[in-house]
Amino acid sequence: MLSRLQQNLTPKQATAVGLLAVAFWSSVIGLIRTVSLHMGAVGGAAMMYSMAAVLIFIIFGRPNLSRFSKSYLFWASLFFVGCELCLSLSVGYARNARQTVEVGMVNYLWPTFTIIGAVLFNRQPAKWWIALGFILSFAGIAVVLGGEGGFSVSGMIANIRTNPTSYIMALSDALFWAAYCTLTARVKAQGNAVGFFFLLVSCILWAKYFSDGTGSLNFDTASLLYTTAAASCLGLGYAVWNIGISRGNMTVLAGASYFIPIFSACISSFLLKTPLPVEFWQGAAMVCLGSSVCWLATRTAERKRY
């Protein structure tokens, strides 16, 4: 039923559905961290993605993989699984609440990367000043990671050295997700394979959990509530986003997503009970502004084209 509804959506309707992902994803970083504190980085992530996969199968049914080309399934699986592993583990491996929010901000370079990917690989027209948005986004990350001193290359490097694994995985997550979005938009994928991708992610995480031998999971009321909330935000977010990028306007979706870093930082700060300095918010605003500049560069070029 939902599959038929998805096929009948107009581009504007599909774009509107995709925009719901902004609300869901704004809560993800704080919830993933909270789950990892209750159930462990790997075990908690495995539980989240298993529950999210079940939720997606209930809502959308079993995906018909025969509708997708083998090459798309291979590359989309690679990008999606890589993205989710990097996202969950970068947050789970963060050393403290402040670092969790910083890692989340690095992850939110993906809107900028997605728009750049649309320009480079999907022939999306853009003005030359899209480069300014790209630079501004990275400058914002430098401010965020520079600490209370603001923009500082040496401070940023010193901060990254305290936990390079989390920061590198967060950057990889942004690149993987941009690649997945670009690929899905390029092939105009018919249908929704997100449930299949989530199943792959959960299987890999469970394999890592059992191979690590990290002990039993903590199934108390709080951990189950947070895990259910995180799984719901993940599952519903990706489900509606996939509808949006498959049938809607990816440039509009990527541009609207520049609100996520600010919303996410607010929610994460509240959930993790960690105050954030003025310099952090300045850097977060620069990341948002950078992605919006990239978006405007494509929108301006698109209007002139027609």
Model-found features: residue ranges?
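Hydrophobic/aromatic residues within transmembrane alpha-helices
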Residues: 35, 44, 90, 120-122, ...
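Hydrophobic alpha-helical transmembrane segments of multi-pass integral membrane proteins
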Residues: 13-17, 42-59, 70, 74-75, ...
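Glycine-/small-residue-enriched transmembrane alpha-helix faces in small-molecule transporters
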Residues: 1-43, 82, 139-142, 152-186, ...
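Membrane-interface helix termini and inter-helical loops of multi-pass transporters
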Residues: 30-38, 91-96, 145-162, 209-227, ...
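Specific alpha-helical transmembrane segments that line the substrate/conduction pathway
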Residues: 43-54, 92-122, 250-269
